[in-house]
Amino acid sequence: MPHLTGLRVTHSAIHGYGVITTRRFAKGELVLEGDGVLYREDDEFDDTYALVLPGWGADGGDDPDAPAVYYDLIDQTRWINHSCEPNTEIDSRYDHERGALRAWWVATRDLEPGEELTYDYAFVGALAQPCACGAAACRGLIVDADPEELAAVPEELRGHLRLAAGRAA
C-alpha cells in the first residue's frame, strides 16, 4: 500500500483502527485520495470497506438516475472511521487520465496534528447500525439523516434514534 503523506494508521478511540493526521490540514484541503476497485450495484463482492457512489455510471458519467457503483477501498482509507460530525467529506470524480472513478477526502475544517480523520458513512436506513462515534450531535445510528432513510430504519434500531434526538434536544 502507498504511504499516506501526513497521515498514520493507528488504534482508534472511536473503533478498531483509524487514520490520524501527523501535520496540519487547512479547511478545503485535499487530505488524501483513496485507491479502490469499482463494482456495479448488481455485482457480488464483499462490501465491508465499500463506498457507495450513487449517480455515477461505471464509465464516469455523472447521472443521478444511474445505478449506484461501489468503490471497494483497498488502501489505508478503509480505516477512516464514521462520525456524525465528520471532519472530512468525500468528493468522487472520474479521472480521465486513469480511466477510473476516484474518491478524495477533503477537510471540512482545519485539522491539527493528532486528529483522527472521520467522514459520515450515511448508510441507507435499512442498513443502519448503532453508532459509537461519540460526537455531541451523534444520531445514535450510522444512517443518512435524510427523512426517507430515517423512516426506513428497522424497528428494532429506532430506539437508538430517539436516544440521539433526546441528547440533541
Specify the residue positions occupied by each region the protein language model found.
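Catalytic cores of histone-lysine modification enzymes
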Residues: 1-93
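C-terminal SET catalytic tail plus cysteine-rich post-SET Zn-binding segment of SAM-dependent SET-domain
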Residues: 84, 89-169
